[in-house]
UniProtKB/Swiss-Prot annotation:
A Pfam family this chain is assigned to: Shikimate_dh_N
NCBIfam families associated with the record: aroE, PRK00258.1-2
Name by which UniProt lists this protein: Shikimate dehydrogenase (NADP(+))
Reported function: Involved in the biosynthesis of the chorismate, which leads to the biosynthesis of aromatic amino acids. Catalyzes the reversible NADPH linked reduction of 3-dehydroshikimate (DHSA) to yield shikimate (SA).
Protein residues bound to shikimate: 24-26, 71, 96, 111, 235
Pathway recorded for this protein: Metabolic intermediate biosynthesis; chorismate biosynthesis; chorismate from D-erythrose 4-phosphate and phosphoenolpyruvate: step 4/7
EC number: 1.1.1.25
Residues reported in the UniProt entry to bind NADP(+): 87, 136-140, 160-165, 233, 256
NADP among keywords: yes
InterPro entries: Aminoacid_DH-like_N_sf, NAD(P)-bd_dom_sf, SDH_C, Shikimate_DH, Shikimate_DH-bd_N, Shikimate_DH_fam, Shikm_DH/Glu-tRNA_Rdtase
Assembly: Homodimer.
GO molecular function, one term: NADP binding
GO cellular component terms attached to this protein's record: cytosol
Gene behind the chain: aroE
Length: 295
């Protein structure tokens, strides 16, 4: 047995499970966390059949696996599979982190906390007291809502292509918003044209699928002016078309690479009880993306 084989044999096994999953940067992120913290972690990719997610997870745990990160298209199935859910997983209606505890499968959703930590810690933008515009009302937006509310912004506006879906999503968070003193408003994307400049926002978060399709959400330019942070949950070697548009309008921009690293750090903390430093890992990933762009 080689030294590498020996270290893997004595390391606790974790995976990111999805379909497809070959593109995932999670193994590189968690390998960096393990080196930094000295934790004995082996982290791999696991592609599950589209009709075999639950069986793949159960088999992984039966073979001694410690935890899973869950990516598309299995986050809703992970929610159903978990025996125990955290409050934020219940609020999100989806799970991206699984682990075994006392024989039960536990599920959490670290996407939203990853988002707010990236915005507040890495981008130095305090959310408390700010006005936030959230574009989209799908799973990504659902996962962001409770962590955003817990930051106590003054107002969260949700705008979605289908207005009723935005309103329905906000209904799920009325109680939490009341608890934290947050005003909620939701409607269709076309309703943004009716906002006055007095109703300008401080942070615009694109949680819609528009960037996947190379589309720019119909956001009035005055909402993306100087002093506004425009954030896209997507990331890539090139800025998304939304971020390019926002930059032309004068906004400060950021993609979702930091969110990816921060949600991974939260999962690592859940599993290992050690919170890794994210800044050096984010810098490594950013450099890798820039190298891909030049290549």
């Amino acid at each position: 047995m080689t030294s590498t084989d020996s270290s893997q044999a004595t390391s606790d096994r974790y995976v990111v499970i999805g379909n497809p999953v070959a593109h995932s940067r999670s193994p590189a992120i968690h390998a960096a966390f393990a080196r930094q913290t000295g934790e004995a972690v082996q982290y791999d990719r696991l592609e599950a059949p589209l009709d075999g997610f639950a069986d793949a997870v159960r088999q992984f745990f039966a073979e001694g696996g410690y935890g899973c990160n869950v990516t598309v298209p299995f986050k809703l199935e992970a929610y159903d599979l978990a025996d125990r859910l955290t409050e934020r997983a219940e609020a999100a209606g989806a799970v991206n982190t699984l682990w075994i505890e006392e024989g039960l499968i536990h599920g959490d959703n670290t996407d939203g906390i990853g988002l707010v930590r990236d915005i507040q810690d890495n981008l130095d933008t305090l959310i408390e007291g700010k006005r936030v515009l959230l574009l989209g009302a799908g799973g990504a937006a659902m996962g962001a809502m409770l962590p955003l509310i817990e930051c106590r912004p003054s107002r969260i506006v949700v705008a979605n292509r289908t207005a009723s879906r935005a309103s329905d999503m906000l209904e799920e968070f009325v109680e939490a918003a009341d608890q934290y003193g947050v005003e909620l408003w939701g409607g269709g994307l076309d309703a943004l044209d009716g906002l006055s400049e007095d109703e300008a926002v401080d942070v615009v978060i694109n949680a819609s699928s528009s960037s996947l399709h190379g589309e720019v959400p119909p956001v009035p330019e005055f909402l993306l002016g100087e002093g506004v942070l425009a954030y896209d949950m997507m990331y890539g070697a090139e800025p998304t078309v939304f971020l390019q548009f926002a930059a032309r309008c004068g906004a400060r921009t950021s993609d979702g690479l930091g969110m990816l690293v921060e949600q991974a750090a939260e999962a690592f903390y859940i599993w290992r009880g050690v919170r890794p430093r994210t800044a050096p890992v984010l810098a490594e990933l950013r450099a890798a993306l820039q190298a891909e762009r030049k290549g």
